[in-house]
């Protein structure tokens, strides 16, 4: 069984490991840099940009895969699934039109409005800076609501700025909106939303167009520094619990979050003829219940590493059920284990990361800790590893309790050396307690 994998980060490393648990699988990977972990699992690799559709086509023609799995969002936004399906290759991932749920934040908000999906919020999209934008932000200010400023298109998770975090006040939000128009960031259109107060969580679903099968809930940590300080990153690490929900969630929260995603899948069927692949909802749990911050059209990174580490099914079976519209016929099951994932990143990440610096990873020592290792933004050159500026290496602890999973992941970070840092507080009970207290406070 030949599988074409597109992408070369830690998320794709987790996908590769999950697929290779099936001995029939032969992996062929197209990625930007040589990820040593993925390269070892692959029969053949091609180094090319994941958005280079000509390179994808050429590699796919050569390999003739039975199935393709798309890791990152950028190729989905370029229409890589449309291309592969035209070649007769089934792909786990949405077509370009359906991928807009991630690649076009305005499309996502309008979908919620049109189909009256629960969990929406105040928003407005703008094509230029002017009086209309200013008066919408002023309206939020009058209501005592802080603004969130988002470029409408893709920015690799780094374009969103929030009043009270990266922006001082709503006046500064106007300046940032103006900057987006001037620089053309994320396509140069701007979405202004109300800031939600609460605790963030994520939920993934495997979708075949009609059926959605859910994974455990995961909590990501987007802030660069301990105690949830610093810049917003692609995610510094994440954890999941043995009971598959999060400690600050009620059963009602779980039910509502799943309903929102089910309604979204139905709306996408009406609007674009269906969505297949992985759907990843990023939620804010507010005192009114879960609300959607945004959707992604693929696995979260880091969350894929938590989820695929405890998936009981053969992942190939799940992928085949997605493309063959057979998800209703299978039970998707996960072990009742806790997982903690921690990223080791270059110093200065995300604002001014060191690049091209060597990093050493003692794989044997990490193996002895019991942690799972995934290489991310590194490049292997003549047997040495160099950081390319984004998150470098991830380690995952899996155990019966969060405490034990956290201890395993933390122990493993000691064996990764270089100009690096990580957040040692992810998965620690103090930080989780802070989340529980925040939710209790909001619910009063």
Curated annotation (Swiss-Prot):
GO terms for biological process: 'de novo' IMP biosynthetic process; purine nucleobase biosynthetic process. It catalyses: 5-phospho-beta-D-ribosylamine + glycine + ATP = N(1)-(5-phospho-beta-D-ribosyl)glycinamide + ADP + phosphate + H(+). Its cofactor is Mg(2+); Mn(2+). Its EC number is 6.3.4.13. The keyword Metal-binding applies. Pathway: Purine metabolism; IMP biosynthesis via de novo pathway; N(1)-(5-phospho-D-ribosyl)glycinamide from 5-phospho-alpha-D-ribose 1-diphosphate: step 2/2. ATP binds at residues 140-202. The keyword ATP-binding applies. Residues 109-324 form the ATP-grasp domain. Pfam families: GARS_A, GARS_C, GARS_N. Mn(2+) 1 binds at residues 282, 294. Mn(2+) 2 binds at residues 294, 296. HAMAP family: GARS. NCBIfam families: purD. Belongs to the GARS family. This is Phosphoribosylamine--glycine ligase. It comes from Methanocaldococcus jannaschii (strain ATCC 43067 / DSM 2661 / JAL-1 / JCM 10045 / NBRC 100440) (Methanococcus jannaschii).
